[in-house]
């Protein structure tokens, strides 16, 4: 009870949220609405037990990621998994971690599952502790009545989709480091990038001091400077889907109408025999 009261006091002085082109994707640590959402903590169990956002449910998203990669994350899978952590279609879900790649990956999987309102806690656990907000150590257990989710296939791109998109001139955006993009560094048989891809490393979307997403004007300027057309369908990719999820989130936050995450990413593309590659090795 005391923790709840302290949390309410801290949240009472919240500042209004930033005005991004796509609203209700981010939530600040001091936002009063956090009292009325399902909060998921995707950090390691030991970190959760050491202290977490009051009322947060620990969600182990690793099995979700494996199922998505294996093409086994169907409606029945999400029906069982999301019920375990108390996710319902009527309550917003807020995800946080100590690494925005984990938060974004989980956000993206929730959207893939068909969750209508999923958001990221801006700045994650770092922002929560920086604001000196209350913490608790007691585990929160929350279950929900299993729901028949309708997964959204438009969130996911596979290799065939990307190959087809190349013919249609869609936007591919590479979230990896510059050395990975140019081919100087490789974690697959082939090095380089998908032909015609635009390079926008995932960390560029964030304030390095706070781990928060750039303010609206700065985010939009960054995207426009890279000549990314937010009205065209976009595909993001990296090595294994996590960095690409950050980029997918950032592009949608900036106003992109259609963004897919090529989840197998370079781990598949760079090892396949039928995929074209561009390289800018010196």
Model-derived segments and their meaning:
Residues 135-138, 189-190, 276-280:
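Short, hinge-like loop/turn segments at secondary-structure boundaries
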Residues 3-15:
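Hydrophobic h-region of N-terminal signal peptides that target proteins for export
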Residues 221-222, 226-282:
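C-terminal soluble interaction/assembly domains
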Residues 13-21, 67-69, 73-160, 184, ...:
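Thiolate-centered catalytic microenvironments shared by cysteine-dependent enzyme domains
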Residues 16-90, 163-231:
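Positively charged, proline/Ser/Thr-rich regional signature most characteristic
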Residues 42-43, 59-62, 96-98, 121-123, ...:
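Active-site-proximal beta-strand/loop segments in catalytic clefts of secreted hydrolases
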């Amino acid at each position: 009870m005391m923790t709840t009261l302290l949390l309410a006091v801290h949240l009472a002085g919240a500042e209004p949220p930033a005005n991004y082109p796509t609203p209700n994707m981010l939530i600040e640590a001091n936002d009063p609405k956090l009292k009325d959402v399902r909060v998921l903590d995707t950090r390691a169990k030991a970190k959760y037990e050491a202290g977490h956002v009051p009322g947060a449910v620990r969600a182990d998203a690793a099995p979700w990621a494996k199922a998505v990669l294996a093409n086994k994350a169907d409606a029945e899978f999400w029906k069982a998994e999301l019920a375990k952590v108390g996710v319902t279609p009527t309550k917003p879900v807020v995800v946080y971690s100590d690494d925005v790649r984990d938060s974004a990956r989980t956000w993206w999987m929730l959207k893939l599952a068909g969750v209508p309102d999923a958001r990221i806690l801006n700045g994650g656990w770092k922002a929560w502790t920086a604001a000196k907000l209350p913490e608790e150590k007691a585990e929160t257990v929350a279950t929900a009545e299993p729901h028949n989710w309708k997964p959204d296939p438009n969130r996911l791109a596979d290799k065939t989709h990307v190959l087809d998109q190349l013919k249609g001139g869609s936007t591919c955006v590479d979230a990896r480091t510059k050395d990975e993009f140019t081919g100087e560094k490789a974690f697959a048989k082939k090095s380089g990038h998908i032909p015609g891809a635009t390079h926008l490393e995932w960390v560029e979307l964030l304030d390095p001091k706070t781990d928060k997403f750039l303010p609206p004007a700065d985010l939009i300027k960054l995207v426009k400077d890279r000549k990314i057309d937010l009205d065209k369908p976009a595909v993001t990719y990296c090595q294994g889907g996590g960095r690409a999820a950050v980029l997918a989130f950032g592009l949608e936050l900036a106003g992109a109408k259609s963004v897919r995450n090529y989840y197998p990413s370079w781990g598949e593309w760079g090892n396949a025999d039928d995929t074209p590659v561009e390289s800018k090795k010196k």
